[in-house]
Amino acid sequence: MSRPTATLVLRNAVVATCDRSPSDAGLLPGAAVAVEGRRVAWVGRDRDLEAEVNAGGAQVIDARGGLVTPGLVDSHTHLVFAGERAGEFALRCAGRSYLQVALSGGGIAVTTRATRAAPDEQLLADAAARARRLIAQGVTTIEVKSGYGLDAPEELRLLRIVHQLGDALGGDATILPTLLFHAVPPEQVGDRAAFVREACAALIPQVARERLAVFCDVFVEDGAFAPDEARRLLQAAKDRGLVPRVHAEQLTAGGGARLAAELGCASADHLEELDDAGVAALAEARVVAGLLPLSTLFLGSERYAPARRLLEAGVPVSLATNMNPGSAMSENVGLTLSLACLKLGLTPAEALVAFTAGGARALRQPDLGRIARGADADLVLWGCGSPEHLAWHMAVNHALVVVKHGRVVHEAPSAAMVDCR
């Protein structure tokens, strides 16, 4: 086999391949990664680099003992919205629950009004700023949902803005759009059946026809959609080639996880109220469990998703920020990793794999979330030498260099400094 000709090399690194198992980050000390174009061409011992790779013309980054991982895959976000809900946050700090606030006119309805009133340019600029904050922390793939328009014209508008987001970022991250059914529009609450029927007959086919979304997601919850309504929406989406996903068991045990298993969804996300039957259903169907600990923290709850039970049952798991204005107003990757360890019971290695390979699996993107020959060259050099350090020094951005498709897209001002103690 001829030697690959590298265009980019990261050497003197601790490489985490994240391609072994959910509990094994695949650490390779004293390693290097060679990139050819947009793909990983070689991974191995640093001392073997010159013999096995033609790196004479490559850009070389000396990791100085730092950790190199796959680019993070944020598999659950709501980046496109307008307005704020700081007043609602204060109400919850005073003891009101999320559902109580929503039933009194707050919640998604507040964001829907602001989003509908905002011009496209504002929505795009705000979403791009949020995405840039994620990229600067090592995220190279972002799933982005619609969901705050609620009615068909507004949902189509939001999905078109999500498509523009990829161009606005200049290819610095992969953007994967999702049509989200968040709630019945206020104009149609008197005839829910008509809304579901019209969505299945018109909105979903148009989204599929115009290729505006890869996924279709439904919020299965009291006050949102019942399992039977979600089943109709998701089956219509599947029939049109969209990949189904669900928000499940976040605030109540609503049967969303079992529905996800029944329909073969790519993922069931949240799961704070998941019971043993739901765990078993996800395990049997091999549906990815999407863990979103920032939401649990933000809502002031101590009832986190049963991550250990899920892993022990063989359920694949992903980890994501769930950045949104109502239940997780944060793009903090470091805090997400730390919460996964402190509150979900994951090891640092498990948290890292969940945020890389797990996210890729939730989005059905096999070339993402791992470092292996032929995989996408999405890489991060961190200012520390281990997954443990990433989770231990919490809520800090440790990303020094972020690479997307073999191109450096972000470099921290302190990129010369690596703390590998």
Swiss-Prot record:
Its EC number is 3.5.2.7. It comes from Anaeromyxobacter dehalogenans (strain 2CP-1 / ATCC BAA-258). GO terms for cellular component: cytoplasm. InterPro entries: Amidohydro-rel (IPR006680), HutI (IPR005920), Metal-dep_hydrolase_composite (IPR011059), Metal_Hydrolase (IPR032466). 4-imidazolone-5-propanoate binds at R85, Y148, H182, Q250, S327. This is Imidazolonepropionase. HAMAP family: HutI. Pathway: Amino-acid degradation; L-histidine degradation into L-glutamate; N-formimidoyl-L-glutamate from L-histidine: step 3/3. One of its GO terms (biological process) is L-histidine catabolic process to glutamate and formate. Its cofactor is Zn(2+); Fe(3+). Pfam families: Amidohydro_1. Belongs to the metallo-dependent hydrolases superfamily. HutI family. Its main location: cytoplasm.
